[in-house]
């Protein structure tokens, strides 16, 4: 009976996704982007686009693609090599926030390279971001010192993070550390509990990435999610599959629903643990195939928007099914 119920739920979701996808495709594609922009309703899980895949384009083009895809704004890269260089944050970031607003888009999340308050750019970035309405930012990555020891490394990083939290409190902004596959801090997920447990979740937390959690945690990832649930304040959404590269196992990011992430268990757990916060949609698979990069800009935009919409429709289907919007 439970299996039948599960199958029916999945079938209903597929039909829902198919319906909204067809409806989206029926919207005339026009350069008059304003006709397609709608202001997203305020909810517990506002969706933002991690800007990295589009950073190489003109910002106006980025805004058009994002607005046409039904995404409410950006999780903007404000880090070395990002859309905004930290050294020019005071002049560049306000302009982009203003321009995004013309498309009905918010910039209330950012991805930084911040790892210490000793860098003079740290306070400049946080002060500017906070003044512009950015409420959440992702911290830079931390490394384990295997010679010093794993536990000792965590204690060192904890002391440093306390100083960052003090700055977050000063500017009323929340800093999140993303769990990421590999041997850096956050890979195992449980280590983030030790890193965060003595800090206020109002100013420091985890940007929980279920894709990376499943890569490293296989069937046990759910344990780490339960452990750090009080500190999960933003969600990074993407999918993956395993493949063999030169005889070795490797992961590849794929469109949502085409990989191995257990979305039903993930969103059910999000609801059970009463987790809420902004969602950053990571589209880290090729948006343009070989040769498509040579197409006219408008044709590129059509291809990009179609792929973004597909991910957005998939995500919205789960948010609706589990009634956690």
Q: What do these predicted regions represent?
A:
Residues 77-95:
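Glycine-rich, proline-tolerant flexible connector loops at the mouths of alpha/beta enzymes
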Residues 20-29, 61-63, 99, 103, ...:
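Active-site acidic/histidine proton-transfer and metal-coordination neighborhood
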Residues 46-57, 111-119, 150-153:
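Active-site mouth loops of central-metabolism enzymes
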Residues 62-79, 132-133:
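Catalytic domains of carbohydrate-active enzymes, especially glycoside hydrolases
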Residues 2-4, 8-11, 15-31, 35-46, ...:
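Histidine-acidic metal/acid-base catalytic patches
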Residues 80-85, 145-150, 216, 246, ...:
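A short acidic, helix-capping loop that chelates divalent metal ions and anchors anionic groups
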Residues 50-54, 77-81, 112-115, 142-144, ...:
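Active-site beta-loop-alpha junctions enriched in small/polar residues
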Residues 45-51, 74-76, 107-112, 137-139, ...:
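Hydrophobic faces of well-ordered beta-strands that scaffold small-molecule active sites
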């Amino acid at each position: 009976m439970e299996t039948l119920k599960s199958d029916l739920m999945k079938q209903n979701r597929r039909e829902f996704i198919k319906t909204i996808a067809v409806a989206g495709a029926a919207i005339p594609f026009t350069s008059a982007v304003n006709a397609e922009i709608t202001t997203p309703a305020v909810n517990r899980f506002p969706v933002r686009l991690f800007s990295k895949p589009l950073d190489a384009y003109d910002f106006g083009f980025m805004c058009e693609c994002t607005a046409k895809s039904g995404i409410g704004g950006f999780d903007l890269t404000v880090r070395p090599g990002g859309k905004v260089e930290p050294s020019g944050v005071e002049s560049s970031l306000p302009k982009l926030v203003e321009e995004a607003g013309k498309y009905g888009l918010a910039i209330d999340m950012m991805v930084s390279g911040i790892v210490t308050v000793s860098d003079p750019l740290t306070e400049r970035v946080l002060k500017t971001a906070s003044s512009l309405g950015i409420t959440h930012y992702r911290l830079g990555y931390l490394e384990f010192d295997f010679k010093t020891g794993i536990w000792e490394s965590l204690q060192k990083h904890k002391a440093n993070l306390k100083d960052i939290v003090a700055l977050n409190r000063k500017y009323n902004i929340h800093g999140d550390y993303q769990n990421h596959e590999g041997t850096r801090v956050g890979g195992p997920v449980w280590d983030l509990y030790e890193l965060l447990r003595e800090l206020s979740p109002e100013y420091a937390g985890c940007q929980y990435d279920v894709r990376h959690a499943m890569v490293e945690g296989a069937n046990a990832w759910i344990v780490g999610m339960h452990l750090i649930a009080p500190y999960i304040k933003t969600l990074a959404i993407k999918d993956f599959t395993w493949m063999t590269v030169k005889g070795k196992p490797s992961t590849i990011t794929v469109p949502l629903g085409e990989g191995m992430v257990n979305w039903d268990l993930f969103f059910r757990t999000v609801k059970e643990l009463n987790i809420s916060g902004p969602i950053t949609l990571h589209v880290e698979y090729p948006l343009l195939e070989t040769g498509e990069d040579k197409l006219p800009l408008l044709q590129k935009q059509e291809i990009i928007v179609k792929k973004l919409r597909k991910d957005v429709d998939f995500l919205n289907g789960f948010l609706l099914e589990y009634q956690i919007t």
